[in-house]
């Protein structure tokens, strides 16, 4: 694949270099847990009200994939923390710490949604009457997870984008504040 990308000249080399930087991969992946979930949530609402089990399964799979995409976004964010820290100003550093803290504290909700959506796909095979309550539960938890993703992303957007900093940075954390 590297040889194929090199055929594009500097552009291909640039892509390969970027994919070796965890902070770059984080920026590529981090929209998936939010935008992917939003699209899947809208589709699941439509599938639920149209009472199409096939459409529900398809959109539940999208919820599952989108919620699971939070894991690599989180991991690459953790790996890229030090490099981004070295590029930020003092306010950006505080927003970076806030972004990391929010992600560390709340990543579990994405995993819970992935598990619930997998159950909502599989359980109705054996218990067909469980389908509607499980889809409603997934719709509800997806809405909460979308809010959570927005909350995490809000701090992340302020790290390197001064133009988005329309409020003071969070207070600097001491070692006592951590954990």
Which ranges hold each PLM region?
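Polytopic transmembrane helical bundles with strong interfacial aromatic enrichment
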Residues: 2-179
């Amino acid at each position: 694949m590297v040889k194929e990308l090199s055929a594009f000249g500097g552009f291909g080399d640039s892509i390969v270099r970027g994919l070796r930087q965890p902070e770059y991969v984080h920026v590529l992946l981090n929209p998936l847990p939010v935008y992917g979930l939003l699209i899947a949530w809208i589709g699941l609402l439509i599938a639920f009200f149209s009472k199409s089990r096939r459409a529900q399964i398809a959109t539940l799979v999208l919820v599952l994939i989108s919620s699971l995409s939070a894991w690599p976004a989180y991991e690459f964010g953790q790996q890229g923390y030090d490099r981004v820290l070295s590029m930020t100003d003092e306010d950006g550093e505080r927003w970076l710490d806030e972004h990391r803290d929010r992600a560390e504290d709340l990543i579990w909700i994405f995993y819970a949604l992935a598990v619930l959506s997998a159950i909502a796909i599989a359980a109705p095979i054996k218990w067909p009457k469980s389908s509607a309550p499980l889809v409603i539960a997934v719709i509800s938890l997806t809405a909460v997870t979308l809010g959570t993703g927005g909350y995490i992303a809000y701090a992340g957007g302020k790290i390197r984008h001064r133009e988005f900093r329309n409020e003071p940075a969070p207070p600097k954390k001491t070692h006592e504040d951590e954990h």
